[in-house]
Structures are given as C-alpha cells and as structure tokens.
C-alpha cells in the first residue's frame, strides 16, 4: 500500500514538515511511524510511504519539527495540527492513496466538536460511517460544526455526477463521527478539473449553500497515471457556514459539599445523580466539580485538601455511595446507618470520622464480596483496562498503610519503585493489595453511572485538572524522572497572598515528558474523559511558565519563573543602574544570570536607591516580567497544550488569573481554550471591575471561585468597594445596603448570565442567594477555601438537602426564567 502525502505549509528556516502515521495491523496491534516530507520551494511538502504490513485502518497528522533535533520521540516537535477529529481511513493493501491536504488549525467553532457541546445539545454519538471504495475513488471529507439534530451535509458540483449545481440532485454525505462528513465517488464519472460546494440540508428539506468561492478539484497529476486502484482524498477543512453561538449556564459545587437525606456525612456519587436532577430542572447544562481524586495520606483533616492527591487517576474512597453497597451482615449494616445519620446531621464535613467510617465499611464489604464470581469477572476486566496506574496505586496504598506514612522514602521496602519487585509484592500480598483495586472498581462504576445519567439529562460534568502532583504520591514514587523533585511549584505574590503561594508540588520536567509525546498527560486526560465532558486547567499559566521555588523555602518570595531568560549583569547595567545583588535572585540552572526579585519594589533595598536607579529598576522589572518572555513563553505553551487538547474530546477551560503575561490570551484564543472571567478580578490594570459585556465569547464567566468569598460574604468584606460596585456597576443611587438582599443577588446573577461568555457557571451558594427563605443564614459557613491559610479545612456542606431544592418551585422557576432570558436554556 502506497501513501502519497502533499500539504501546503510555509515553513521558517530550520523547520521540517513530517507525517505522524498510526496504523492498526490485522493482528490488532498499533504501530507508529514518522515520515519526513520534502519541499522544493518551502511551501509544498510531499512524501511517499510504503506500508507492507497488512492493515485494517490508518490515521495520520502533520507535525512541524526542528531540523536540528534528530529524534523519533516527541523531542524536536515544534507544532502539531489540530487532531481532535482524526484523519482516519480504511486500509486496502492493493491501493495507492493520494492525500491533498491543508494544515488544520484549531477551528473557530472547535467547541462544537467537544463532548460538552454534544451532551448539552442532546446529540447522539454517531458511529463512524464506512464508505465504498471504487477502483478509482475520490474521497471527500468536510467538518460541519454546529448542525442541529436532523440536519445533514450534501455535495453538489458542476458535472452530472455531482448534480450539475441542482441542490435537489446533491449527493448526501455520511457522518463519520464528531462532526465530520464524507462521501466517495467513482473517478470514472468525473471530468477534470471540476468545481463543487457543500450544502447544509435541514430536516424540513431547506437548503443553505456554503459561503465563498467554489471549491476546485486538483488538476491531473501523478495519481491519474497510476495503474491499478487508487484513492484520492480531499480533506476540505470546515464547511463555510456561520455557526450559531452556543451559551449555557451551570452550577459550581464541590462533590463533598452535596447533602441528601441519605448522605453518609459527605456528598457522594449517589448525591451527584440527585444534584443532576436539580441542575436539569433549573435549566442548567453543566456541573463543575473540584478534584475528586484520592488524597489519603495521614487520614487527618489536612487530607480534605482536594489539590494534594496521592494519584492523578484513583478516585477518592470517601465518595463511595454506601447505600448502593449494602452489607450482608444486617446487624453491622444497621450500626453503620446510625453512624452515618449522625455524621450527616453535622453542619460541616467531619473528614476524619467520615473517612474512618467509610474505610471500615468498605473493608467489611470486601471480605463479603471478594469471592463473588460476577464481581471477579467485572474486576478482572477493570484491572486489565487500567493496569498501568492501578497496580502501582494499590501497592503504594498498602505500603502507606503498612508503614503508617505516605512518605515513601521512609519505607523499609520498595522506597524506590522497581516494576518487577512491585509485581512480586502484589502477588505475595494479593488479598491486601486487592482491596484497593476492589474499591476503585466500585468508585469507577458509580461515577461512570452518574456521568451517563448526566448525559441522559443533557447535563455535562466539568472536572478539575490540578497543576501539580503531591511529592508523596504514586506518581512521584512510580515515575520520579518526570518531575523536578527538588523544586516546588507556587505562585508569586498577588491579591490572594502578599508572600505568594508555595504549593509544595514538584515541578514538571517537560523535556522528559516530551520524549514520548506527553504520554503521561494523554493517559491522565484519557482517564478523566471517562467521566467528564469538560475540564478546567488549574493555573494554566504553568504551561507557559511556573513559579518555581527551591524545596524547603518557607515562602514563595525566593521563587523564579521557569523556564526563563535570566539577565546577565551587563544587561542589568544597560538599564542605567549598577548591579545590586539584594534586588535579584540568581537563576537556579544558569550561574551569573539573574531574575529581579519579585515584589521588591517598595521594600527597603529598593527605597534606598537614588531616584534615577529606582526608575531604572522599575523599567527593568516591568520589561522582565511583562515583555521579555512573551514570545518565549508562548512557544513553550504551544509545545505542550496541543497534546492535552488532542488527548480527548473534552471542552478545555483555563484558569488564567493572577500575574498573566500578554502571550497567554492569544495562545488560549488560538487553541480554543476558554478563559476565566471574574468581574471583581479585572484583567485590565487599574480598573476596579471588569465590564461583563466585554467578556470574550470563548470564556467562562463566574462570580467568584472556590478560593474567594461567596457573593454575600464579599459584599460585607469591604464597604468602600461594595459602595463603588453598587453605584458604578449596578448603577444604583444612594448608599449600598449592608445586607445583600435576594433581589439584588438576582440582579447580579442576571448580569452575569447576560454576558457574552460561552459558559456562565455560578456557585451553589450564589444561586441560592436569590431566595432569602432558602439561603444559608450563616455566611461564614459557605466559605470553601481561604488561600492564605495552607492548613485550611475544606469542609463546606450545603445547609439543606437536595430534595428541598427539587421542591423549591419558586426558586427553580426564577432560575429557569433568568436562564431562558439570557438565551442559555
């Protein structure tokens, strides 16, 4: 089988175009191959590949590589095509294939190809269509985002075979899944060259022709001279039609915060299904959760922090719905029910007692069920699907519990990971290690059911992708080579913390991760996509650069951005000031290269400088942090983020708050990543409040995040700020009321819903603030996190059961009316 590739792409000096080919052999094995292309003019790149192995199907994508880096791994890849909808073809060893392609950037309407869009619009997953191949075949492919249920695509052109421009004789195309349509036509019925267009056909037969000039077939070429059978594939990008803007409203709530009459002291996967009912009833289409992964390290309240997981894959046992898992021992069952009723009556989560009770229960359940033939069959299948992470996780958990610590350096056995030794350990402790796999199987089953239920109610789940991993995690033990274990990630000083934030997470070794095409990230996101249709990248700035702090530093003030372009002493002096070591921090990897010390302006070391040196340092400081790195950091992000986007069909959202370089917005826009917009944290310097009507369409609007106070709490925190908001934003005269009344809450919520943002996601507390009879009278109880307190106890729970929300007719009708008026229903 011969594959001939041709693509138009204008490269820069030192760049090459290559094809990344993946084919499935007749034995079911997947093979990868890189094919370098050649060019005579720097614009048209061509190449030939001979596939000798018998194949079922193949797919390919184009990449741009650095000619100075010779590698078959991910090293040297400068850019990738958008590949969410793959170029997938049936293989026929007797044929020659010709591909006439254009580089695929992220489409304007890339959100239409996501699971979130599919779920919210109630679209059914389309099975891939198979098309007939003739002895000589033209194969047309086009993307058609934003089609309504029942709409389809057809092809019409200037020849009898193509309908002679008669829309009633247009050739219906077949959906191939994820918004792509295709059709095969015998070349024997076509005269070259020919012209054609795509049309959209409505369920009622109405027709809409695509905009722009007619499309042109390629002229006669080498393909027409081939003896035997051939396929010429025309990948035509996206149909040229305007896509209606899609806007939805949704709910933000931590899973642990949910409460039902049957909860066991914490929100669980069963409660999630009940909350899905309320979300759908109120006209919303999304639920955003905090991370739900296992954080079990010390079994103290500090494990309540959801961003310090011991695994990026394993779900937290605390979220098991025990109502679905009854014990055979009726006496024990009754005893546990009394315990969880007491825990559920508490106003806040008692993390220590809840996890203690749930683990005790799950151990008893394991003893009762582990010999079950049905369970063993399901369990074996589950283990086989995820063995890459499950075995290390299960052994890690058993060793943690054996030695009483998750600090694996203190373990007497297997303090360093060894695959064969870990496998032998699991075999010799199969019963004990098997418990953790058993629990993960139960959790996976319950969450998968909840996700499928959400899909049936046209509600999509949005997950949270933490920026870091715990230094005491499975990943740090299993694959330490992927991380800088001697460094910690954090954030420079900002509105949340004057000394910055030291999160304690090791930073990523991006060069090592690139060697296998970011396998670690692809597996992580593939796991998330089993449950979620969208996700939030926590601190997306970390994919451009990370605030890196030497491990053990008490604060983040001694950190520096990595990667970076630090200054030489000569560069510093070129700003018109002598080198003052107190104002700088030496680069961690490059001796005699310097970073201006973050936040030093205004401190004693800066104040004692002469005025002209103060001004020179301010120029240097602003240039270094806001201009010098823009192109460099953008190029770093463009190496990493496309791999994340292509790893799944989830809608990608970024948390881009804080000290945001100018390059971040354009890169997110280019990749179709939704930004985060918070009116009280404007991205324009010196402006007290952002203007909601200026929000970009590709964004998530929210009133406040989990790191901030709720709307009512914020209203009371700063009277001067509240008065400014009341007069200038809400445009009310007079003195702002000291308490935020329900009608004012509703007005604020309506303003946010009416913003141009694609998603408007509002916290449960702020939705409930509309109704003075339902909202929590204790404002402080609604606070989820206080970032300035690294030991904060994450324990907020809603003060009333979900059933009360389902019965709250007045509130639900009010919310539905607001959503419908904002065209988000």
Annotate each PLM feature:
Residues 303-331, 475-499, 555-580, 673-685:
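Acidic, His- and aromatic-enriched active-site or binding-groove loops in soluble protein domains
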């Amino acid at each position: 089988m011969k594959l001939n590739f041709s693509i138009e792409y204008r490269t820069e000096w030192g760049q090459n175009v290559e094809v990344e080919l993946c084919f499935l052999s007749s034995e079911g094995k997947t093979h990868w191959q890189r094919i370098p292309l050649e060019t005579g003019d720097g614009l048209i790149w061509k190449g030939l590949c001979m596939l000798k192995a018998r194949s079922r199907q193949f797919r390919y994508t184009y990449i741009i590589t650095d000619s100075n880096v010779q590698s078959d791994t991910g090293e040297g890849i400068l850019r990738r095509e958008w590949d969410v909808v793959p170029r997938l073809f049936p293989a026929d060893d007797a044929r020659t294939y010709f591909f006439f392609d254009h580089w695929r950037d992220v489409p304007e309407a890339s959100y239409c190809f996501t699971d979130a869009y599919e779920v919210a619009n109630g679209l059914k997953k389309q099975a891939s269509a198979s098309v007939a191949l003739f002895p000589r075949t033209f194969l047309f492919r086009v993307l058609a985002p934003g089609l309504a249920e029942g709409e389809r695509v057809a092809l019409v052109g200037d020849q009898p075979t193509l309908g002679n421009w008669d829309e009633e004789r247009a050739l219906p195309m077949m959906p191939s899944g994820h918004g792509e349509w295709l059709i095969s036509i015998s070349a024997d019925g076509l005269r070259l060259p020919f012209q054609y267009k795509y049309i959209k056909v409505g369920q009622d037969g109405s027709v809409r022709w695509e905009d722009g000039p007619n499309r042109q077939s390629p002229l006669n070429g080498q393909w027409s001279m081939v003896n035997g059978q051939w396929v010429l594939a025309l990948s035509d990008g996206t149909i040229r039609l305007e896509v209606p803007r899609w806007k939805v409203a949704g709910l933000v709530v931590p899973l642990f915060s949910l409460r039902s009459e049957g909860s066991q002291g914490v929100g669980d996967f069963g409660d999630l299904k009940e909350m899905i009912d309320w979300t759908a009833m109120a006209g919303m289409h999304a639920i955003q959760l905090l991370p739900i992964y296992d954080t079990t390290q010390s079994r103290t309240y500090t494990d309540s922090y959801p961003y310090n997981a011991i695994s990026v894959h394993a779900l937290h046992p605390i979220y098991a719905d025990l109502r679905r898992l009854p014990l055979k021992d009726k006496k024990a069952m009754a005893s546990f029910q009394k315990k969880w009723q007491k825990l559920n009556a508490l106003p806040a989560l008692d993390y220590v007692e809840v996890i203690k009770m749930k683990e005790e229960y799950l151990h008893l359940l394991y003893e009762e069920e582990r010999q079950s033939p049905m369970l063993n069959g399901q369990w074996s299948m589950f283990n086989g699907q995820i063995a890459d992470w499950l075995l290390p996780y299960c052994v890690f958990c058993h060793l943690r519990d054996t030695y009483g610590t998750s600090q694996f350096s203190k373990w007497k056995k297997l303090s360093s990971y060894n695959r064969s030794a870990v496998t032998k350990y699991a075999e010799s402790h199969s019963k004990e290690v098997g418990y953790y796999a058993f629990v993960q199987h139960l959790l996976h089953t319950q969450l998968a059911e909840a996700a499928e239920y959400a899909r049936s109610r046209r509600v999509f789940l949005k997950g949270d992708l933490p920026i870091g991993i715990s230094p005491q995690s499975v990943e740090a033990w299993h694959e330490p080579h992927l991380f800088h274990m001697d460094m910690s990630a954090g954030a420079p000083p900002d509105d949340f913390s004057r000394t910055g934030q030291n999160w304690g997470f090791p930073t990523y070794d991006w060069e090592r991760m690139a060697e296998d095409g970011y396998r670690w990230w692809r597996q992580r996101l593939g796991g998330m996509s089993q449950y979620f249709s969208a996700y939030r990248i926590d601190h997306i700035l970390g994919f451009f650069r990370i605030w890196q702090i030497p491990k053990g530093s008490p604060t983040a003030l001694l950190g520096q951005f990595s990667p970076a372009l630090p200054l030489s002493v000569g560069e510093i002096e070129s700003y018109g000031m002598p080198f003052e070591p107190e104002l700088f921090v030496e680069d961690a990897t490059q001796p005699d290269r310097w970073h201006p010390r973050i936040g030093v302006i205004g401190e004693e070391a800066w104040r004692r400088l002469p005025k002209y040196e103060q001004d020179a340092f301010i120029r240097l400081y602003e240039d270094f942090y806001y201009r010098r790195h823009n192109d460099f950091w953008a190029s770093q992000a463009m190496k990493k983020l496309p791999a994340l986007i292509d790893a799944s069909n989830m809608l990608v959202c970024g948390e881009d708050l804080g000290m945001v370089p100018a390059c971040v917005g354009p890169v997110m826009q280019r990749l179709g990543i939704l930004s985060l917009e918070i009116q009280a944290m404007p991205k324009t310097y010196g402006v007290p409040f952002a203007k909601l009507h200026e929000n970009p369409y590709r964004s998530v609007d929210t009133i406040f995040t989990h790191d901030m106070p709720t709307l009512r709490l914020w209203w009371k925190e700063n009277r001067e700020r509240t008065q400014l908001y009341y007069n200038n934003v809400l445009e009310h005269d007079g003195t702002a009321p000291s308490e935020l009344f329900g009608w004012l809450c509703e007005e604020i919520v309506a303003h946010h819903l009416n913003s141009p943002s694609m998603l408007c996601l509002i916290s449960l507390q702020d939705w409930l603030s509309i109704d003075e009879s339902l909202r929590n009278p204790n404002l402080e109880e609604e606070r989820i996190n206080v970032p300035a307190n690294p030991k904060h106890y994450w324990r907020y729970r809603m003060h009333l059961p979900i059933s009360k929300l389902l019965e709250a007719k007045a509130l639900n009708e009010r919310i539905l009316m607001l959503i419908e008026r904002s065209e988000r229903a």
